[in-house]
């Protein structure tokens, strides 16, 4: 489902209602229609991209004959950690030295962090847009 949402314009009833609601919230928050359209587009892409990645993991889990998501993700993280620790440190010092930080948080924490980062950026850009002269604004 997430894959189908990529590179398409929402035309289904549910997608249209969700888009209308989100777009309305952004406009009511004081964004210009153009700015709100860009923000909504980026938020939607973030959500759909995350859903698509999750669907890829579920497919891999099933293909591996696993039923427990925790077991799958622990094995997935072990595989990444083992690979990064085998990299030549002189070529990849940051990945090698910080592999535990790179793999520390689970999908939910990463999703929440990314969403907050995106929302904070939209809020900051909107606040900055309000202080720019009309020619510098997204119209």
Feature roles, as predicted:
Residues 2-3:
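C-terminal module of multi-pass small-molecule transporters
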Residues 6-30, 34-41, 81-93:
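Amphipathic alpha-helical packing segments from all-alpha helical-bundle domains
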Residues 31, 56-139:
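C-terminal peripheral helix-coil segments that are non-catalytic and often amphipathic
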């Amino acid at each position: 489902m997430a894959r189908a949402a990529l590179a398409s314009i929402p035309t289904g009833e549910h997608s249209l209602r969700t888009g209308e609601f989100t777009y309305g919230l952004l406009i009511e928050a004081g964004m210009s229609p153009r700015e709100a359209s860009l923000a909504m587009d980026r938020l939607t892409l973030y959500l759909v991209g995350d859903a698509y990645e999750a669907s890829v993991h579920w497919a891999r889990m099933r293909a591996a004959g696993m039923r427990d998501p925790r077991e799958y993700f622990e094995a997935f993280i072990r595989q990444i950690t083992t690979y990064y620790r085998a990299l030549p440190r002189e070529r990849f010092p940051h990945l090698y030295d910080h592999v535990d930080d790179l793999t520390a948080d689970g999908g939910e924490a990463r999703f929440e962090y990314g969403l907050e980062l995106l929302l904070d950026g939209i809020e900051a850009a909107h606040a900055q847009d309000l202080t720019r002269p009309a020619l510098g604004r997204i119209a």
